[in-house]
A protein has these predicted regions:
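A compositional/structural signature for long, glycine/proline-rich flexible linkers
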Residues: 1-121
């Protein structure tokens, strides 16, 4: 899909329709045979999906500009991602491998500060 078609899809609403259809498809995980079928667990499943949606919007919409990166907290108590450590404070930001960045700040009382880079999505 070229840029012109992408813009047309935004203008005529197809992009939004596709987004909403993908949200409908996301619920299929809650209805697998192996998934609990009681009201409490089903509601928790919807809650978890809505939190994952919020995390995705924060990452890919609100904080996706590598020309103006800013740290934000993706994994947190109200948005668990599965393998986060409760003793750690995770921060993320979008970067471009073709650019150079400088991080400034104070480490404070932290005994360890680790920085990792990852390629792709």
């Amino acid at each position: 899909m070229d840029e012109h078609e992408s813009l047309e899809r935004i203008l005529d609403g197809r992009t939004w329709d596709d987004f909403c259809d993908s949200l409908k498809d996301a619920r299929t995980a809650l209805f697998r045979e192996s998934s609990p079928a009681n009201a409490f667990d089903r509601a928790e499943g919807y809650r978890h999906l809505s939190r994952l949606l919020r995390v995705a919007l924060e990452r890919f919409v609100e904080h996706a500009d590598p020309e103006h990166p800013r740290f934000y907290q993706m994994a947190r108590a109200d948005a668990k991602l599965g393998a986060d450590n409760p003793d750690c404070c995770y921060r993320n930001c979008a970067l471009d491998g073709r650019r150079e960045y400088r991080i400034r700040g104070q480490r404070g009382t932290s005994t360890y500060l680790g920085i990792g880079t990852y390629y792709g999505h």
